């Protein structure tokens, strides 16, 4: 995702937020805490499985998928959390997908979107998300902290996404407990697992790290397993003929 493209997305989000009603806060969906689970299950590389119909880089991925059935297959095969794309314009997602999936699974769900405003956080929680995504590249450090604090006050966990060392340092300063490293270069749009490997020496004790993007095979997962608590996988699972088998290949035992 180029910086120019990210700017386009954020402009669209600003327009959406302007039209968005402030919802009444509903009760938080009950499930386990992701950070607690990662802390207590470090013997395996955990899989966060994503429901994603399309993306700007790949176009349509799987438009006809039964999203609830896909999510339940993820859960049945040991996914630690389900990531749900809710951006409509660029990813062909919908908030209703998050609502439907969250009502049919027991594990945590992540609202995968470009969050820039508190109204979006309330909507995510009301739709059943227990975790939201905040992208360092999309926010000033001050705004990031405001949204992070707001989400945690609402009982939500936050996956703070980074792309390089400078952003990783921002996440550390923030006190983020769960940190994502996205292997997609925001300038060139290319993906490279080496991004995750290169940032690993800067990881800190007491935090949980998730590698995102460009993870397709068991070999990819094995490369990341020494450094990461989990991986976020979308396209490989949405395209897989045998979803259950693909998840098992990605769940690397660390011994």
UniProtKB/Swiss-Prot annotation:
Its EC number is 4.1.1.48. One of its GO terms (molecular function) is phosphoribosylanthranilate isomerase activity. PROSITE patterns: IGPS (PS00614). One of its GO terms (biological process) is L-tryptophan biosynthetic process. Keywords: Amino-acid biosynthesis, Aromatic amino acid biosynthesis, Decarboxylase, Lyase, Tryptophan biosynthesis. It catalyses: 1-(2-carboxyphenylamino)-1-deoxy-D-ribulose 5-phosphate + H(+) = (1S,2R)-1-C-(indol-3-yl)glycerol 3-phosphate + CO2 + H2O. Pathway: Amino-acid biosynthesis; L-tryptophan biosynthesis; L-tryptophan from chorismate: step 4/5. Belongs to the TrpC family. HAMAP family: IGPS_B. This is Indole-3-glycerol phosphate synthase. It comes from Streptococcus pneumoniae serotype 4 (strain ATCC BAA-334 / TIGR4).
